[in-house]
Amino acid sequence: SKFGSLSSQSSSVDTSSQNSNLGLLNFSKLAHLDGLLRQKQSCPTIIFMHHPPISLSNSEPPEHEYENFRMIENFAEIVDRHPQIIAFLCGHIHRAFSSHINASPVMVTPPPAKRLCRGAVDHAKMPEVAFRLHSFKENAFKDTTVRDC
């Protein structure tokens, strides 16, 4: 893809854990990401990851989706060193959510399908099915959420 006259790159970060469904960003994963980002510092980069790397609330302690909050802090330190990151695309929480890390948007995609449940289901409590369409336009990252009617 193109970003102005520069090529862009995407990088996927494995946030899975063998211990729980919470995210894991250990030293090895963070060092690998940092190394990849150092290789192409002038190349606009989109980071794909399952667990959103941000606090999801204003509560104390903060609600997050990682085994411990320090993992998010360590990730943020790496992000601070790499201004070429233009967006973070995530999932996991099954609802649309947007935030920022520095100037880069963090976009959480809502579920592409309703959950398959056995027994009676209250569909009013389920998130809307949706998808996001991402594009570059006029040297900016654009995001549009399109919902199923």
Give short role names for the model-derived ranges.
Residues 2-17, 46-48, 105-110, 145-146:
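Active-site-proximal beta-strand elements of phosphoester/diester hydrolases
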Residues 17, 53-55, 115:
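Feature marks short, surface-exposed loop/turn motifs that line or immediately flank catalytic pockets
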Residues 78, 96-149:
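Binuclear metal-dependent phosphoesterase catalytic core
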